[in-house]
């Protein structure tokens, strides 16, 4: 049974993937499921930029949202039955109906492939803090893409998963490590009529680990972006290029260079007014020899360090955080890089 594709979904579906609607009637949606399915997803937090790798470098953290999805063919062909249960982060803030980001993204992907949204029950145990620069929205988009992969007959190819999620998210620096794990360099190919994203994996040095300082304050990604200048001096750009190149070497081969490699000249200083306490903590940690940066759009602080220094870093981080002179409070947390990205376990 099929029905007309709503206009807003036709628009949202445009450009998701070059072959998104191949083989499907342009104005028809149909049921994707022949029987009910149930599966469990585990999606890691992420940290993007890593200092000089603005909108390019990102890594996955072993700190995960756990989601269970039950899907069944629609009982009512005119409207799906959708229910979302959220525990943990965002439990008192996130919608529990079809307006939830995961549901709207799944609906968007399915519509682009020619299918309607089936009946869905989503139970989310959220651990990733929201609006802290730790990839909570990328985790939601990853959940949506992998849910769609389970629902679409034949699934989504690895390339479709890369392009669809990156286009919905807008940039791949958080999304790619959430999907695939580890550390990644991602970029947008030039001279393409539609956004075309590419990525290359990096294997981090076995001694590299992470320490986070998670503040009680939140930060809008868009508000942080709005503070950036239209252009920067050529000298600053050149310095940043050298540090970004060095960071690839440091994080994979020579961790002793991480402090120099994480110097940023493109975004952090311009955003200082948005999270002064976080920047003060970054300054103190870097002054003590730790490779501290703002995680993503902030305000969380990330330190890339050798495992042997992680405990002392967390201790120092807690002491420095109490001395910033600001009202913000920070919770130190040591986390390894997640070598595995999002996982899916089919339950039936």
Predicted regions and their residues:
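A generic local secondary-structure boundary/capping motif
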Residues: 29-31, 55-58, 166-168, 172-176, ...
